[in-house]
Every structure is written in C-alpha cells, then in structure tokens.
C-alpha cells in the first residue's frame, strides 16, 4: 500500500540526507518524549500542561508522549514517516500556540525550536523517509527518481 503523501521518488543523495534528517529529528523528539516520561510521567506532564492552560491536558499529555517518543522511534526506522510528520507538525503548532507564542527565541521561552521541528515534520510528510527506510522496504514509497535514458535513432 502506497501512502497518499510522502511518496516522492528520491535520488541516492536525497536518501542520505533524509536518513540524516530522520535520525536527527527522531533523536530530538525521542529525547523530549523521554524527558516527559522521566520527569513526572503522564500525570506530571498532564499537570504541567494544565498549568500552562492546554485544553484536555491529560489527553494532550498522552498524545505528546506518544507522538514524541513513539513517533521518534518510527521516524528513526522510517516507518509511517509521512503520518508522523503531519502529527508532529500539528503537535508543534499546538506547542507554539499554547506555550511559546509570546516570544521567538528559545532562551525567552519562544517558538523558534517548535517552529523548526514542525516544519521538518512537514518536510518528512512531503518527501517520505527515503529508500533507507521501513516504509520503502514495505513498498509504501516509490522506488527511485531515475528516468530511462532516451534512445537515439
């Protein structure tokens, strides 16, 4: 089954870049998800979200942990990458709106990091994981971009 989006064919160089991007972004998201688990767990994260005025804080906390930790693992593997990318973008849009919108720089509690993470999620949603991925191995992504050479008469 091919995914409806993130199904762009890639060149070998693009595959390497996508792998590096997936590993980097996945590691950042796993670290943020693990931080939530390690520093208060679901209950503590929900309490923190409620204190920040995030609606449906327990559900939002469960989603945040799942999409950061679980989504990070999936993206490192290159599995369901376009779907996770869209969910990350939505998650980061919520973080920007509810928590970080009053400043730009991270040092000021601003949105620069969540903006970049969300944008990179959209890039992965649009491009897919590349050929070095579970998505490719399972046939959810196009083979490659090379076109047959023209034959001269």
Spans of model-derived segments:
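Membrane-interface interhelical connector segments
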Residues: 38-59
């Amino acid at each position: 089954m091919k995914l409806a989006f993130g199904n762009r064919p890639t060149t070998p160089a693009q595959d390497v870049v996508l792998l590096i991007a997936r590993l980097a972004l996945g590691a950042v998201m796993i670290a943020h998800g693990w931080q939530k688990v390690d520093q208060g767990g679901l209950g503590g994260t929900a309490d923190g979200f409620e204190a920040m005025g995030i609606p449906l804080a327990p559900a939002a906390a469960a989603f945040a942990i799942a999409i950061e930790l679980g989504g990070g693992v999936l993206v490192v593997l290159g599995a369901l990458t376009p779907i996770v990318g869209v969910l990350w973008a939505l998650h980061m849009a919520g973080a920007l709106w509810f928590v970080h919108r009053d400043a730009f720089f991270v040092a000021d509690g601003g949105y620069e990091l969540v903006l970049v993470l969300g944008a990179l999620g959209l890039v992965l949603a649009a491009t897919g994981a590349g050929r070095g991925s579970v998505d490719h191995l399972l046939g959810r992504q196009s083979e490659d971009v090379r076109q047959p050479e023209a034959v001269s008469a």
